[in-house]
Amino acid sequence: MLTLDTLNVMLAVSEEGLIEEMIIALLASPQLAVFFEKFPRLKAAITDDVPRWREALRSRLKDARVPPELTEEVMCYQQSQLLSTPQFIVQLPQILDLLHRLNSPWAEQARQLVDANSTITSALHTLFLQRWRLSLIVQATTLNQQLLEEEREQLLSEVQERMTLSGQLEPILADNNTAAGRLWDMSAGQLKRGDYQLIVKYGEFLNEQPELKRLAEQLGRSREAKSIPRNDAQMETFRTMVREPATVPEQVDGLQQSDDILRLLPPELATLGITELEYEFYRRLVEKQLLTYRLHGESWREKMIERPVVHKDYDEQPRGPFIVCVDTSGSMGGFNEQCAKAFCLALMRIALAENRRCYIMLFSTEIVRYELSGPQGIEQAIRFLSQQFRGGTDLASCFRAIMERLQSREWFDADAVVISDFIAQRLPDDVTSKVKELQRVHQHRFHAVAMSAHGKPGIMRIFDHIWRFDTGMRSRLLRRWRR
């Protein structure tokens, strides 16, 4: 069967112009105009989707099939083009019957044209084919427009669903244009209104806990620039003043035992005049035990040394992905669970804004994984937020899972974040030593988000930084009172 793309080529119908007209009409629709005004950040993201729409429409037109009646009429037209005028005159009755049988729009006009002329000339033959071609072009254009209209309605329905989803989540997850673009890409999944309302719920909870939100922002910004030593750094001359003992005495600095007759103390010199003590004086002189003044001098001189330029380059430390481990034990239920989930939502917001990855692992008796920054990030976030915290605590398995993930090249610059109350058994020595090795050799950083003031110090000592958010009733009341 003839495809619409082939028909357009045969009749020189410009499908590109039809596609552009449809896209312009779609972007100018009142629904999108109101949405763009309300959410300007998402306008650029939707506009970036236009090439994908254009390609999808081209593919739809290319694969569309032409109705059998139109296909048969086109075949007849092509055969008629090959006929000479005498042959055309012979075939004309069959052509007119075929057009009538196919209910062609050209059938009635063709018969009127033939009836109006008693003689079929070469000019009439050419005119007949030209008008027939125009009729076929009109039919092909109409078919293109019908298909594009169907696609427009379907595309508009899809865009409206995604706009509803993105509009609800934009205040929660989109902090800049980058985040808005990634949020729009994530909205392509099959989601219902009741699904993403869970994200809205935890977003509202996060807004009610500004200290928790601020804590997540501080953790996200915690990797700063530092000076990086270079093997090929240039050497610089460094001048410094050095103090050295002088050979010429300058001042009395104290007393000492020596044989220096010139600096004897008067009492020692007096013993020399006493006969009974004269031999004692000589003995102490030989043994260098006479009390004398200690004279000391010092001088300063400039010393020049060469050293590498260690502060020549300041390389911004890359803000890598987040690997977040969340404790789902029974002690983390209730308000702790709400805070942990809201904190992960805040990290997801930071990851979207800074084009980072956010990988969540839930640890209790088993490890459950979610990637909140991937193409299915919204669906993954909904599944994560739907989890219940009622397992046990296996912190060692959590660290082993983190270390296994950090071995991968794509996670070599990741920051590990552990959210827990840290009421657990001590870590095995092999886990502790491996974590320290990652910190020392690979500069991986481990952050603790402590949800309790009663976490074990022996466990928390392993972390580079501890971010405390006490969820006890007293702390909650104090935070509410300060607001």
UniProtKB/Swiss-Prot annotation:
Disulfide-bond pairs as recorded: none
Keyword annotations: Chaperone, Cytoplasm
Q: Which domain of life is it from?
A: Bacteria
Q: Where does it localize?
A: Cytoplasm
GO cellular component terms given for this protein: cytosol
**Per the record's keyword annotation, is Protein transport included, yes or no?**
no
Q: What does this protein do?
A: Component of the RavA-ViaA chaperone complex, which may act on the membrane to optimize the function of some of the respiratory chains. ViaA stimulates the ATPase activity of RavA.
Protein family per UniProt: Belongs to the ViaA family.
Q: How does it assemble?
A: Homodimer. Interacts with RavA.
- The entry's protein name is Regulatory protein ViaA
Record the organism. Answer: Escherichia coli O1:K1 / APEC
Organism lineage reads as: Bacteria, Pseudomonadati, Pseudomonadota, Gammaproteobacteria, Enterobacterales
